[in-house]
Amino acid sequence: SGLAKQLGISRHEAQEYVNRYFKRYTGVEAYMNNIRDRARKLGFVETIFGRRLYLPEINNRNAHRRQYAERSAINAPMQGTAADIIKIAMISMHNWLSSNNIPAKIIMQVHDELVLEVAATSIDIVHEKIDHLMSSAATLDVPLIVDVGVGKNWDEAH
């Protein structure tokens, strides 16, 4: 298996790791099975915001194609929702910066990060607003934790 190869252990040991993980985090296996079954029935999965990923190979007889679609079915709702949330935060941030004539601009998005260029005089207000806008980009059962870094370059900000 991929886990065995990645960890440099036998397939049997890797399967034991997986079994222990599922035993400790009981909801994970149920979630995965539920998502897989739903994807097989509907042919797609959705993010929390309703964006769909269609999975035409989810019922394929070819095991490799089917398993790839199953992995996508399991990963896409979470990864897609994270992508949706960062886009919502980015739009909110852009709108706030524009409507308030803040001397700052969004430079890029990297996974779940936004990188901004901000005038030194506006760092404090932008810092505070980023925290608020990003943490309130979606209402979830868990909090969205935001870490804001400041520096003269991306490396320093980390």
Kindly give the residue locations of the regions a language model identified:
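Conserved catalytic core of nucleotide polymerization and phosphodiester-bond processing enzymes
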Residues: 1-158
